[in-house]
């Protein structure tokens, strides 16, 4: 079945997947999940209908605790209900999660997994919020990229309707929630074919109704509580099979190969990593590179259904030739013998043919710390370093306190040939991020290229440094890490050239665009010596543009984003510049007209760029 291609981020994909199944959405905004609720709200306001022929009813509460209470009440009243959250917001929902799961009420919570504040607040991604919910009774389904959010988000809704067990569908905050990819989308009718409407009707009949009274929410004594608590076992035993069935239905429709645990790599791999989340795409890319270039035999087991955890399915996924396993967890559980996924894997392999295989435990990516192919290579190589082998390790940092970190050997360019990487340095609120979001959507929607965009910025957002990372190529892009070897680098703020080491990221023969007010002798005076040396030694094509001057001439003030966006399309030569300018104007209309902004001046900044 051919599906329509669209360019969107993970939050939009989650909203797209959830909307057909949602009658009520109880919401409270929290970074980085807010966009899911915002998009749902916009569609509902426009009268977009769900599978049941009605727009979604939105209820914004005073906090996430109130939102989860509303979810509980709405489900008890017989309305299919969804919410979206992350981090402390998810923690506030935990008391109600126990109630929802205990009463076997089908719902899905879409979570853009985010760090939970410990010694400091961090608004970026890891799995500490997800792991905090693993004993609530919610099933947990993980998506590793934007396409999987679209597909597995749908599987979560189908499975909860069928099996009554509520689901947390999670994906990495920022790295997946805010990453823009060109993906295949569901049509409403394609989803309708897979829904068990008899189960929907059964759910509605269980709703609280004074015409059919039932007793719920009782206080039970020791004589019966234990027995009643165990009564849910058959439902949880059935969930892995239900999820697998719906994965197979999706596979049949669209030609994918979703399983509870997916294996990737050499069929006779000797070293296998077990992980879940966006790091899996980086691991797959690294496996492809090392197996081809260095003749290694490496593999990955990608965890999709984390709860209920099916040990036999994990064992099936691991090649019989495996001699070493490394489990990567994106959280820290101080005082524990190991992090949660590691302990699950150790318990699952006890008493199997892998009982004597060495299993190492690694931590990575806390608070969105970048995880690169070079670090993944170090994980695989750790097993071969007999004298320095570390059964417990960290990657991505230099631990000079407890010496757990693995050493990495420089940069590893594992991206497939033909992938173009571009990097843009901007100032928060100068429009650089917004312009690049439009740029990647133009490339994705108007060429046959695959496209990816990710935007790195600090918690201040406005006034801080922003770095936009754009990739495009003829093959799917699995590079879920920051660009450190770029074909094109643009500096949109001249003061950065003396503060940040940006030109060293440009590949030999690449392009550097500097927005500055300097000309000729002034440029030679202000440009640091090491920058000039690198440009000369690596044959870098160097261009300058006075975007500030152009912006002031046409009345834009300091908003130089569209001027520099035009310059990028001119230099990158991806699509004809006249077409690019037309698409940029269309994108600006879509982005800003609803905000009452001035869209064009004469001449347009896109023409002047």
Over which residues does each language-model region extend?
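Anionic-ligand anchoring segments at beta-strand to alpha-helix junctions in alpha/beta enzyme folds, i.e.
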Residues: 24-60, 274-301, 421-485, 489
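ADP-ribose/adenylate-binding Rossmann-like module
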Residues: 505-527
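Conformationally flexible catalytic loops at phosphate/diphosphate-handling active centers
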Residues: 52-56, 167-262
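Peripheral docking tails and interdomain loops at the edges
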Residues: 324-413, 544-555, 559-595
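Thiamine diphosphate
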Residues: 1-132, 137, 154, 373, ...
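Conserved thiamine diphosphate
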Residues: 123-173, 350-365, 537-544
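Rossmann-fold NAD(P)-binding glycine/threonine-rich loop
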Residues: 520-540
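Conserved small/polar residues in nucleotide/adenosyl-binding loops
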Residues: 600-609
């Amino acid at each position: 079945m051919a599906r329509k291609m669209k360019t969107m981020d993970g939050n939009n994909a989650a909203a797209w997947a959830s909307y057909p199944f949602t009658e009520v959405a109880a919401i409270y905004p929290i970074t980085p999940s807010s966009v899911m609720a915002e998009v749902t709200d916009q569609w509902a306001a426009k009268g977009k209908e769900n599978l049941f022929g009605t727009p979604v009813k939105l209820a914004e509460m005073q906090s996430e605790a109130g939102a989860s209470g509303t979810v509980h009440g709405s489900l008890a009243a017989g309305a299919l209900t969804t919410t979206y959250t992350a981090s402390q917001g998810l923690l506030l929902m935990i008391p109600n999660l126990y109630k929802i799961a205990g009463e076997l009420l089908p719902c899905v919570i879409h979570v853009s997994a985010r760090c939970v504040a410990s010694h400091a607040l961090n608004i970026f991604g890891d799995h500490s919020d997800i792991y905090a919910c693993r004993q609530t009774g919610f099933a947990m389904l993980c998506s590793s990229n934007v396409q999987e959010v679209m597909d597995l988000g749908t599987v979560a809704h189908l499975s909860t309707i069928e099996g009554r067990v509520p689901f947390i569908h999670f994906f990495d905050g920022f790295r997946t929630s805010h990453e823009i990819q060109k993906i295949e989308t569901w049509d409403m009718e394609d989803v309708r074919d897979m829904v068990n409407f008899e189960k929907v009707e059964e759910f509605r009949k269980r709703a609280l109704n004074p015409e059919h009274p039932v007793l719920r929410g009782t206080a039970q004594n020791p004589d019966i509580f234990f027995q009643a608590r165990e009564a849910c076992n058959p439902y949880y035993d059935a969930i892995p099979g239900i999820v697998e069935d719906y994965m197979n239905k999706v596979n049949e429709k669209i030609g994918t190969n979703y399983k509870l645990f997916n294996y990737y790599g050499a069929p006779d791999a000797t070293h296998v990593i077990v992980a879940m989340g966006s790091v899996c795409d980086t691991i797959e890319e690294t496996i492809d590179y090392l197996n081809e270039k260095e003749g290694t035999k490496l593999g990955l087991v990608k965890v999709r259904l984390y709860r209920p955890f099916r040990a036999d399915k994990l064992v099936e996924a691991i090649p019989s030739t495996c001699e070493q396993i490394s489990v990567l967890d994106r959280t820290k559980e101080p005082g524990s013998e190991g992090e949660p996924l590691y302990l699950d894997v150790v318990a699952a392999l006890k008493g199997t043919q892998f009982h004597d295989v060495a299993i190492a435990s690694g931590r990575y990516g806390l608070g969105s710390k970048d995880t690169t192919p070079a670090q993944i290579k170090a994980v695989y190589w750790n097993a071969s370093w007999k004298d320095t082998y570390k059964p417990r390790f960290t990657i991505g940092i230099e631990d000079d306190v407890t010496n757990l970190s693995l050493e990495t050997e420089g940069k590893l360019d594992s991206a497939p040939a033909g992938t173009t990487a571009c990097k843009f340095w901007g100032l928060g609120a100068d429009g650089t991020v917004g312009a690049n979001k439009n740029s990647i959507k133009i490339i994705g929607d108007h060429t046959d290229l695959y496209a990816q965009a990710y935007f790195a910025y600090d918690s201040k957002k406005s006034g801080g440094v922003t770095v936009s990372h754009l990739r495009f190529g003829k093959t799917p892009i699995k590079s879920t890490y920051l660009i450190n070897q770029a074909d094109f680098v643009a500096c949109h703020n001249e003061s950065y050239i003396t503060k940040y080491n940006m030109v060293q990221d440009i590949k030999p023969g690449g392009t550097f665009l500097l927005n500055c007010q300097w000309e000729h002798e002034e440029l030679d005076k202000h440009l640091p010596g090491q920058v000039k040396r690198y440009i000369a030694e690596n044959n870098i094509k160097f261009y300058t543009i006075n975007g500030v001057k152009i912006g002031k001439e046409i009345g834009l003030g300091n908003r130089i984003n569209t001027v520099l966006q035009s310059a990028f399309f001119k230099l990158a030569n991806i699509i004809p510049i006249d077409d690019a300018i037309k698409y940029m104007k269309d994108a600006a209309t879509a982005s800003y007209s609803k905000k009452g902004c001035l869209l064009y001046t004469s001449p347009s900044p896109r023409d002047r760029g």
